[in-house]
Amino acid sequence: MAQPFEDWYKNLPIVTKIYMTGCVVTSVSVYLGLVGPLRLYLNFPLVFGKYEFWRLFTNFFFYDEIGMNFFFHMYFLVRHSRLLEESSFRGRSADYLFMWIFGSFLLLIMDAFLFYTKIVTKVLFLAPSIAFMVIYVWSRRNPNMHISFLGLFTFSAPYLPWVILIMGYLFNHDLTTDLLGAVAGHAYYFLEDAYPLISNRRLLKTPGFLKNLMDGQEQPIVDAHQQQEVQQAQQQEVQQPVQNFLNEDDLDQQ
């Protein structure tokens, strides 16, 4: 039993592996009482008034205490993050890490704006937002993939974020964190994919130190035939029903 999990974990791409590990360690620490959620959540008065700067970082690593809701979030996130990192970011782990950093900064800026303008004051953890950003970018990068919903109907991948939002609305969940993630994901998609086609200029450039940091960590770039095989394998995977992801627990916002 341990060996298959060890092999699965070992084969995870580097950025997905690091983030998943950080989330698991954080939630286990909370479960064991080593740290409380009150020490992790995002609180701007404490950040800037009490200099508790770690909150800008830790709020991205806590979804929930160990339980079904946590495992649903982890499975959904790791699945799509791995698909994204192994396909359009294959051989470009530094670029993928930069996407996460860009999204995190943008989410912090948006959350600070909402907090200080008193539009929304209860976004305590941005982990669901960063996960939704990953799902959004994956969906836009895979327009030809199809997803089966409960075996009743299928839709193309770009509609996945909106299906999740609609389900959240039907279950009367707060959609703030998901909407923030959608904005961050679309901002990255526009600046990285759409804007260069319009202007022939690229605004987002991965810093050299990140490339040096990730040197040797990237998965090898595959040729066109191998890339097609990877995409076909991923197509088969995303054809699986998504009922495990679109239920009430999975859409629960922290």
Swiss-Prot record:
Family, as annotated: Belongs to the derlin family.
Function: May be involved in the degradation process of specific misfolded endoplasmic reticulum (ER) luminal proteins. May also be involved in endoplasmic reticulum stress-induced pre-emptive quality control, a mechanism that selectively attenuates the translocation of newly synthesized proteins into the endoplasmic reticulum and reroutes them to the cytosol for proteasomal degradation.
Principal cellular location given in the protein's record: endoplasmic reticulum
Record GO biological process: endoplasmic reticulum unfolded protein response; ERAD pathway; regulation of retrograde protein transport, ER to cytosol
PANTHER family, sorted: DER1-LIKE PROTEIN, DERLIN
Higher taxonomy: Eukaryota, Amoebozoa, Evosea, Eumycetozoa, Dictyostelia
Residue ranges annotated as Lumenal topological domain: 39-95, 140-146
GO cellular component: endoplasmic reticulum membrane
Keyword Transmembrane helix set for record: yes
Compartments, as annotated in UniProt: Endoplasmic reticulum membrane
Topological domains annotated Cytoplasmic: 1-17, 117-118, 168-254
Sorted UniProt keywords: Endoplasmic reticulum, Membrane, Transmembrane, Transmembrane helix, Unfolded protein response
Protein name: Probable derlin-2 homolog
Annotated transmembrane regions: 18-38, 96-116, 119-139, 147-167
Keyword Zinc-finger: no
Lipid bilayer topology: Multi-pass membrane protein
GO molecular function: signal recognition particle binding
